[in-house]
A protein has these predicted regions:
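Catalytic-site neighborhood detector that most strongly recognizes the C-terminal catalytic loop/helix
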Residues: 216-224, 228, 232-235
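Conserved GNAT acetyl-CoA-binding A-motif
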Residues: 14-22, 184-196
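Hydrophobic, well-ordered secondary-structure elements that form the walls
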Residues: 142, 159, 180, 184, ...
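Substrate-binding beta-hairpin/strand module that engages nucleic acids
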Residues: 190-217
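Conserved acetyl-CoA-binding loop-helix of GNAT-fold acetyltransferases
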Residues: 1-9, 167-184, 193
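Intrinsic disorder at enzyme termini
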Residues: 236-249
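A conserved beta-strand-loop-helix scaffold within acyl/acetyltransferase catalytic domains
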Residues: 4-170, 215-216, 231, 247-258
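Feature representing long, continuous alpha-helical segments
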Residues: 98, 102, 174-182, 187, ...
Length: 258
């Protein structure tokens, strides 16, 4: 509360137009609104660890049809003619980043036009936080062809970037979703956040989950207009979550999705 109050005060003192806090906790979200900040409710797909001991334990919580679909996808993905490496800490070498940089540039160029991270960024995280990085790479004929970068939190695995130079059926799902789930289970993590968007994640065990952000806008009339929009958006997001929850792959009645 004190930190948010101070930040708002600095904005006012320096005549700044706005202040934004993204991906805050529910508690921070409520505190910020008490201080007059605008609250925004959004939605992502997260995988939640319900105390699973193995990936098969997770599969056993799914309906029979969804369980079979995932097994088929994994089988096809792992038959691409190469191998998948799951690397963290000192297992990650400097040369791995040269390959991942190529993947990152390819994805960025296709989706957003200009990748915003620099090559130096990957060298920097290698030196400063390698112990908090999970790099999952697909290798074929001694060449890395695809990969995903994840960051390891105290309770959560954060999936952030994916890219490839060769495309194979279901390899994206295997590297970004299923291997991430396996890592979370094996390392006692409570959640996997696989990034924004993607209703395709639903069938793979990632459930619709509310996310929160806070916004202070200095111009009062603009702030009121934004607030009106955020109220209607929040209602729409919560309706979407309610609808999507009915289509999760879990056995009916086995899980609380709140």
């Amino acid at each position: 509360s004190l930190l948010l109050q101070s930040a708002i005060g600095l904005c006012k003192q320096n005549n700044l137009s706005s202040l934004h806090t993204t991906f805050c906790s529910r508690q921070e979200f409520e505190l910020g609104q008490e201080l007059g900040m605008l609250g925004r409710v959004s939605q992502q797909f997260h995988w939640l660890n319900e105390g699973y001991g193995t990936f098969d334990d997770f599969l056993s919580a799914l309906s029979s049809r969804k369980r079979k679909n995932i097994k088929k996808e994994r089988e096809k993905a792992n038959n691409f003619g190469g191998e998948i490496e799951v690397l963290s800490g000192t297992q990650i070498k400097k040369e791995h980043w040269s390959f991942f940089w190529e993947f990152y540039q390819d994805t960025g160029a296709r989706k957003w036009g200009t990748p915003y991270l620099t090559r130096q960024f990957f060298d920097e995280i290698h030196e400063t936080m390698r112990s908090k990085i999970l790099l999952i790479l697909a290798k074929k004929e001694e060449k890395y062809i695809a990969g995903a970068l994840n960051f390891i939190g105290s309770k959560t695995l954060f999936g952030r970037y994916w890219g490839c130079v060769e495309d194979y059926p279901f390899l994206h799902f295997e590297i970004c979703y299923y291997r991430a789930i396996e890592f979370a289970i094996n390392n006692g993590l409570k959640k996997v956040e696989a990034g924004a968007q993607g209703e395709h994640k639903l069938a793979r065990g990632y459930v619709p989950t509310e996310t929160f952000s806070l916004h202070w806008i200095g111009e009062e009339r603009f702030s009121r207009a934004v607030q009106d929009y955020l109220i209607s958006e929040k209602n729409a997001v919560r309706r979407d979550i309610e609808i999507l929850t009915d289509f999760t792959p879990f056995k009916k009645g086995d899980r609380n999705h709140d």
